[in-house]
Amino acid sequence: MLAFPNAKIHISKRGWIHFHTTHKHPHDGRDTSIPPQILAELVGKSWDRVVLLEDEETIAPGLRTWWSGGHHRASIAVEVDTKNGTAVLSDTFFVMENVLNNHPIGITENMYECMTAHARALKSPIIIPLYDPKNFDRFKDGVVA
């Protein structure tokens, strides 16, 4: 973020509120969620670049986000229109099997939100689980579309 001084910074509004109103959380440490130097930048000189995302947002033509929940309060899905159809990626599903088997990730806040996100992701022809090493097999040379 600091390397791109002209970029807008899009953050889940739900996640932002959760971050600022939760004092103890079993797997979201404040300093690991948003390191102090980044937080200072976000609420300081970069605040005018921060966009707090509603549950459904269109960022630009062909680029949308939706709140997916499941993993944590800041989890979102990003949809990108490509020549091969819509691609969706999210941290609510780590590997493809999470989506295909409707099996929530191991560290989840709400398994029902995960299952809802899986069902919605399955509507897209291209699913990109963020942490799946098989993405390199699915997408030759790392090219999605």
Regions found by a protein language model. Name each.
Residues 75-145:
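Cap/insert and terminal regions of metallo-dependent hydrolase folds
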Residues 10-67, 109-125:
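Metallo-beta-lactamase
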Residues 5, 46, 74:
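Residues that flank catalytic or metal-binding motifs in active/ligand-binding sites
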Residues 64-76:
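Active-site glycine- and acidic-residue-rich loops that bind
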Residues 1-11:
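Active-site metal-binding motif and surrounding structural segment of the metallo-beta-lactamase
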Residues 58, 69, 79-81:
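Well-ordered beta-strand positions
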Residues 15, 72, 133:
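A generic "binding-loop/recognition-motif" signal
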